[in-house]
A protein has these predicted regions:
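Glycine- and other small-residue-rich loops at beta-strand/loop junctions that grip anionic moieties
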Residues: 3, 26, 99-100, 125, ...
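Structured adenosyl-cofactor binding patch, chiefly the S-adenosyl-L-methionine
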Residues: 12, 17, 138-143, 205-243
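Short, ordered loop/turn segments at secondary-structure junctions
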Residues: 28, 53-55, 127-129, 175, ...
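Active-site/ligand-binding-proximal alpha/beta "capping" segment
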Residues: 170-224
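RNA substrate-binding interface of SAM-dependent RNA methyltransferases
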Residues: 19, 46, 87-176
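Short amphipathic alpha-helix with an adjacent loop that forms part of the alpha/beta core around
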Residues: 80-88, 161-163, 181-184
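N-terminal positively charged helical leader segments and presequences
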Residues: 1-85
Length: 243
């Protein structure tokens, strides 16, 4: 099955990360945004096909900006090798694990946030989670190409592996949690984020060293997982940089 993404930002990122196999542009005139994609593709010697504007409907009915890219699939990294290589020494690490995040928009936004803030690794399960489709890649604005992502059979297996390397495991939940502002994060930190409606499964929460929550100062009761992840990632990495 061929994978297509669309839109200026996602296509530019795919080109820069050498994940783009072909670019489709309108042959009926191009604006500055499309010309930027054209120049980037030419610089990397990526083939360009110029097609009628009407033909873009076969790719998507959403706002494609008349820019579509055929991309190579997301390549997952080997979690065990990555942790073994990067956890040694004195540099801090942040690993994010997802337990049942099924909304593609939330997953894409979370990936973009994780890459922007410098999360070292994102771990997703093979089942019970949104797949890394072109919609997720677009929602991430192409950040899915540059973030280290590992796929595992079961999140529990990933937790056991991280514990064997002395990672501290934090579960994000509002139930019986310690406020984020009262937590001192360890050098090797792993944070688990759960399903948008049900949260982290009890069996997974039971493996956490500490349950943490975001303090609420307003009237709404909760945040979606992508918004919550931004706050959590920032505070963890802020502490690491100030240590």
């Amino acid at each position: 099955m061929e994978n297509y993404i669309y839109g200026h930002h996602a296509c530019i990122e795919a080109i820069s990360m050498e994940k783009c196999l072909m670019i489709y542009l309108s042959k009926e005139g191009r604006n500055q945004t499309q010309q930027q994609v054209e120049r980037a593709a030419n610089a990397r010697k990526i083939p360009i096909r110029y097609i009628p504007k009407e033909a873009f409907k076969k790719f998507t009915k959403e706002n494609h900006q008349y820019v579509v890219a055929l991309i190579s699939p997301i390549e997952f990294i080997d979690m065990s090798n990555f942790i073994d290589e990067h956890s040694k020494g004195t540099e801090p690490m942040v690993v994010a694990l997802l337990d049942g995040v099924t909304d593609v928009g939330n997953l894409g936004n979370l990936i973009r946030t994780a890459e922007f803030l410098g999360v070292n690794l994102l771990v997703v399960p093979k089942t019970g989670s949104a797949r890394l489709t072109e919609k997720v890649i677009r929602a991430s604005s192409g950040a899915a190409f540059s973030l280290n992502i590992a796929q595992v059979d079961h999140i529990k297996d990933a937790i056991y592996l991280l514990k064997s390397y002395d990672f501290s495991i934090y579960g994000a939940s509002e139930k019986k949690s310690t406020s984020l502002i009262d937590v001192k994060f360890d050098r090797l930190t792993a944070v688990i984020l759960g399903d948008e409606s049900k949260g982290i499964k009890p069996s997974i929460l039971g493996l956490c060293d500490q349950i943490i929550g975001i303090p609420k100062f307003g009237k709404i009761d909760s945040l979606n997982v992508s918004s919550a992840s931004a706050i959590l990632f920032f505070e963890i990495i802020r502490q690491h940089h100030n240590a």
